[in-house]
């Protein structure tokens, strides 16, 4: 029992009282601490607090229903030592492992079994991290001087920098002589018909006091008889509508 040195508190579970004092003295000398005793048949009625002992020594291992109780009675990393047992070591070690003990082993020379309580208290919880988070890029520390900006001039070819030919900017039906379609529905046919009617106006009896009537509405007086008509060449005959130069009343 030299492996149990410097343990403060131990529990000895006995079946034969004939060697009780001798066993207790041996445990005291090996551990150097206090030793409590308990009968194996009274163990189920005991009321020991959890994590009370550093070592529990059992003389007879007929405790199938009490291994879990012993696990609670031991402190974290506490030892369980069986010095006498009934049954095969393999079956006992399996029962002990299923009760929560670890590092279970057999000493065939001494005919003993030893197990250990995990280094944490029964029922303890710990947070598990199954994946490591990748370190994020600290964008605030990126210097703007390191950015390579594209020069807009490099995106233009020599052909893009040449000025276009005005003759190539003409759009069909918007320059030159206007002509309405056969089935015109945009109003161009009516507009051209109105211009033809207006351009044929007779200005033989009309006289201009300012001499600027032919230039267009921008140069005409408010009472000009040609107001609203398109510009015309000097001396060109322009026919006025019949309702012009007549009072509305």
Swiss-Prot record:
Annotated segments matching region Fe-S binding site B: 210-224
Binding site for [4Fe-4S] cluster: 210, 213, 221, 224
Biological process terms in GO annotation: iron-sulfur cluster assembly
Sequence positions that bind [2Fe-2S] cluster: 172, 181, 184, 186
GO molecular function: 2 iron, 2 sulfur cluster binding; 4 iron, 4 sulfur cluster binding; electron transfer activity; metal ion binding
InterPro entries in the record: Anamorsin, Anamorsin_N_metazoan, CIAPIN1, SAM-dependent_MTases_sf
Keywords assigned: 2Fe-2S, 4Fe-4S, Cytoplasm, Iron, Iron-sulfur, Metal-binding, Mitochondrion
Gene3D superfamilies, sorted: Vaccinia Virus protein VP39
Location of the region described as N-terminal SAM-like domain in the Swiss-Prot/TrEMBL record: 1-130
Function: Component of the cytosolic iron-sulfur (Fe-S) protein assembly (CIA) machinery. Required for the maturation of extramitochondrial Fe-S proteins. Part of an electron transfer chain functioning in an early step of cytosolic Fe-S biogenesis, facilitating the de novo assembly of a [4Fe-4S] cluster on the cytosolic Fe-S scaffold complex. Electrons are transferred from NADPH via a FAD- and FMN-containing diflavin oxidoreductase.
Domain notes for this protein: The C-terminal domain binds 2 Fe-S clusters but is otherwise mostly in an intrinsically disordered conformation.
Subunit structure: Monomer.
Protein name: Anamorsin homolog
Species name: Drosophila grimshawi
Organism lineage string: Eukaryota, Metazoa, Ecdysozoa, Arthropoda, Hexapoda
């Amino acid at each position: 029992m030299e492996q149990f040195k410097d343990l403060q508190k131990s529990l000895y579970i006995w079946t034969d009282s004939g060697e009780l004092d001798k066993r207790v003295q041996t445990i005291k000398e090996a551990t150097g601490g206090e030793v409590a005793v308990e009968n194996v048949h009274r163990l189920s009625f005991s009321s020991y607090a959890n994590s009370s002992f550093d070592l529990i020594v059992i003389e007879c291992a007929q405790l199938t229903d009490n291994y879990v109780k012993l696990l609670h009675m031991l402190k974290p990393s506490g030892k369980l030592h069986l010095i006498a047992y009934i049954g095969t070591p393999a079956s006992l070690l399996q029962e002990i492992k299923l009760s929560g003990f670890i590092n279970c082993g057999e000493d065939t020379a001494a005919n003993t079994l030893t197990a250990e309580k995990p280094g944490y208290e029964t029922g303890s919880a710990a947070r598990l991290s199954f994946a490591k988070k990748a370190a994020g890029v600290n964008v605030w520390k990126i210097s703007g001087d390191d950015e390579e900006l594209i020069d807009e001039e490099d995106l233009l070819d020599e052909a893009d920098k040449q000025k276009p030919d005005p003759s190539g900017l003409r759009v069909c039906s918007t320059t030159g002589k206007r002509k309405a379609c056969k089935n015109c529905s945009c109003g161009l046919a009516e507009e051209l018909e109105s211009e033809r009617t207006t351009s044929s106006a007779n200005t033989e009896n009309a006289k201009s006091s300012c001499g600027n009537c032919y230039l267009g509405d921008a140069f005409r007086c408010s009472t000009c008889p040609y107001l609203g008509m398109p510009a015309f060449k000097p001396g060109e005959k322009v026919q006025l509508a019949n309702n012009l130069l007549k009072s509305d009343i």
